[in-house]
């Protein structure tokens, strides 16, 4: 969940005249019979369609574990301590070995808004090229791939380059999380997302990062055919047809097979983790809350993830799968997968919308809450796949290093580390509550230039 993905939804209620009890009973009885028959038929048909893809439709969503909503953290006012701490972080250096996320410690950065585009992260480029269109799908569908394609190719070649990898490597970054669209991996008939030379640019950058700096790379599918969350990052605004659709599931597996082939042919197979889904929600009114996924949505995600695990196993079980938790926490997903599954849970923690999140109070909250989010029930490791520095209130430029150092330290102490969102933000249009502009709190490279990111953790609150 980035700044561009937070929306608030309300619900209304209607007052109706009460029908007679007998009529109500008849209607309910008839409706229940119809719903039961239709639902049973739909589920059976879907199960057959999923079976044809070599999968089993999951139906045990009610067996989930505890929900710990990472998007609804409450920050309490405290007396802020003056002391800051210098901490030593032993970042992992995997070498030629496959990593174990239970012991791996990631000092990561996201390369977002590169192979999937987001308006907030490069406002001038968006205004000059995409204009008033809300997302890539609408833009390319309107102007045609012959127009948007060459523009996107230029962006792929320039937004992140080996110079950026050098900058990150110099600051001790050992992990890259790289979001992509499914169109980078497979062509879906009727899709408005551009399929071009994304893999070529990804290959050049990841080969360099792995060979020069021994970085580990998480390849993420931020979108899936049909849309996973009604947001632009999920495919396009208003799209959520990925759920309960076997055709879209089939194309999702085709994308996964392409990612696996990319990894297998890299000559660096040990250096990758696959993240097959991101911030999924089949009930957008409840996005980033426990209401954001229905039981049917949970079942569909588990059907997909178990299918992905089976495909990974055909290549090499040592390649980890990273499951983004949809803001539900590791504990929620834990019961669905047996111990020993090569699975790591990806949790996203942001404070730009957290209740009571004044900048001065957040570091103490991080120290207290990271343990519960990062450790879960202990069955599967947790990686904080996205975090930033913006808080809801009273942002100050001087407090950024404490916010950065505290999160980096706490997430490696209690979890498997984290990845800052984002590597770049070029946005001098949008402000924040307090000092500075949005990009002052969301751009890793700008933070590095300002001395906020350094080679030492010396301003941690804990």
Predicted regions and their residues:
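N-terminal carbohydrate-binding accessory modules
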Residues: 20-173
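Extracellular glycoside hydrolase catalytic/binding regions
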Residues: 85, 254, 261, 265-273, ...
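Helix C-cap/helix->beta junction micro-motif
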Residues: 209-213, 315, 414
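Short acidic/His/Gly/Ser-rich catalytic and metal-binding motifs that mark active-site loops
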Residues: 184-188, 225-235, 283-286
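An active-site-proximal structural segment forming one wall of the substrate-binding cleft
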Residues: 154-176, 190-223, 234-273
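Structural recognition of the beta-strand scaffold that forms the well-ordered cores
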Residues: 106-115, 174-180, 216-219, 223, ...
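Fungal secretory targeting signals
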Residues: 1-22
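Substrate-binding cleft of secreted/luminal carbohydrate-active enzymes
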Residues: 107, 375-461
